[in-house]
């Protein structure tokens, strides 16, 4: 059986957590393939809020196996903290021995470099994700499997500190001594060793046994290292194809690809955001949508739906359908805008240029509606809400197959 993919196709924070949690109830295995604890996903179940960063959303399904793949960078401190929320995780959670370790000094490097950039800072979460991926690519990083031999790992990290002493000195970063470091690594080993394994073989076996598998993306397509709004991007591949490299499976193993989008747009940090709205409307969207970052708590920038960007991301990911999230946040607006094209250097364009800094949105307006909260049947949606969805389908050429009308799991429309 093929593995289905959930992927964000805006700038992250699209609401993937709710959809993965809802769908995970019918899957045997849920996998993360990239990112780190810079990517938060929020799930609401029976009025209770769960904020996860590394552990897949399938953890709330007691029957599902959850896999953190080789493409993820894992902070032992953070995953141990997350794991403490749950009981009986052995046999339900597995971490790739090839996933790279995101250690405390990586975050210090990240934060120091951002400070040095001043007003040219990217706006990272400061969690050390970039430095960890940089070490992975330069072949100087450390992997989860090395935690199983903490004495050797300690020596290797101390040698790394020695070789990079000039960098740590310039950035004014102090490093732990041998005793401190070894104690830290021994604690990690004690708490994490039962979960570290060869996850590629685990996923292959599940595929061969026709298990139902869901691949959960983190962040969003517009933050992809290659295809996003570079350099204001993350350090990993956030598109559906990244699921293959991040788990060790081949493209033929991929099934249905669902792109997750908000009914409007948000972005955290710096970088181009064509439809950002600085008026009262943008402020209202942020307040009603409670648009604050799961990881950083930072206020998200808010704006109207960018159909040009979504069309680009849908094609890039090969989306079979879209899941439209937070439609209820637009309740009560008299007019709702949709970006249908851009203006660049005085010309109208219908594609995403490599440099988004100078594009201006071209909008169409749609009449608003009163409320969609709690509606679970497409036919019961207000007429104008249906028109809004149809406009998105028309421009993106992708069917909106799932519609969320409140944070609750049950308040979701599934279209046949």
Swiss-Prot record:
Enzyme superclass (EC): ligase
Biological classification of the source: Bacteria, Pseudomonadati, Campylobacterota, Epsilonproteobacteria, Campylobacterales
Binding site for Mg(2+): 13, 40
UniProt-listed GO biological process terms: 'de novo' AMP biosynthetic process; IMP metabolic process
Residues that, per the record, bind substrate: 294-300
Nucleus among keywords: no
Protein's UniProt name: Adenylosuccinate synthetase
Positions annotated as active site in the UniProt record: 13, 41
Cofactor binding remark: Binds 1 Mg(2+) ion per subunit.
PANTHER family referenced in this protein's UniProt entry, alphabetically: ADENYLOSUCCINATE SYNTHETASE
Organism of derivation: Aliarcobacter butzleri (strain RM4018) (Arcobacter butzleri)
SMART domains reported for this sequence: Adenylsucc_synt (SM00788)
Protein EC: 6.3.4.4
Cell compartments where the protein resides: Cytoplasm
Role noted for this protein: Plays an important role in the de novo pathway of purine nucleotide biosynthesis. Catalyzes the first committed step in the biosynthesis of AMP from IMP.
Pathway: Purine metabolism; AMP biosynthesis via de novo pathway; AMP from IMP: step 1/2
InterPro entries per record: Adenylosuccin_syn_GTP-bd, Adenylosuccin_syn_Lys_AS, Adenylosuccinate_synth_dom1, Adenylosuccinate_synth_dom2, Adenylosuccinate_synth_dom3, Adenylosuccinate_synthetase, P-loop_NTPase
